[in-house]
Amino acid sequence: MPARPAIALAALLLCSGLAGAQDASFGQRLYRDKADCQFCHGVNGDGRGDPRSPGKAPDLHRTRLDREQLIEVIACGRPGSEMPHFDKYAYDAKDCYGLSAEELGKNIPPDPHSTSLNKREISALADFILATFVGK
């Protein structure tokens, strides 16, 4: 392989590794700070959150949710539970579980106690949870 393509390939591989590390760091900051998932799910994702959290959160190591399902749960919350929805537009239409806010009534997931997340942040958070906790 000529030197220039080899250098370009090495640079590409290095950058992709850095991007992965940056994505993981971004997801970790969302988990621990912005979304404050650790408040309920615990720093280690084991469901041992703060005693002041609204309820027992699932152990993320044991979840069977795939990426798309995890994204939906983060965006839409869990109807009838304390799991908040982090997409501020979650129930404006029928984007969550095919249901509207009116149809859910009192079972609508609560607003997040911290802040809402955009689609990029929701995806990064799901990727962090999958890479860090699920099945480990």
Go through each PLM region and give its residues:
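Boundary at the C-terminal end of the N-terminal hydrophobic targeting segment
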Residues: 19-21
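Sequence/structural segment immediately N-terminal to covalent heme-attachment motifs in c-type
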Residues: 23-44
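Sec/Tat-exported extracytoplasmic proteins
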Residues: 34-35, 41, 77-78, 87, ...
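C-terminal capping alpha-helices of c-type cytochrome domains
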Residues: 92-136
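Extracytoplasmic/secreted proteins, especially bacterial periplasmic and envelope-associated proteins
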Residues: 26, 65, 69, 120-124, ...
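Bacterial N-terminal signal peptides that target proteins for export
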Residues: 1-8
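Gly/Gly-Pro-rich "capping" loops immediately C-terminal to redox-active cysteine motifs
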Residues: 45-103
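N-terminal signal peptide c-region/cleavage motif recognized by signal peptidases
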Residues: 15-16
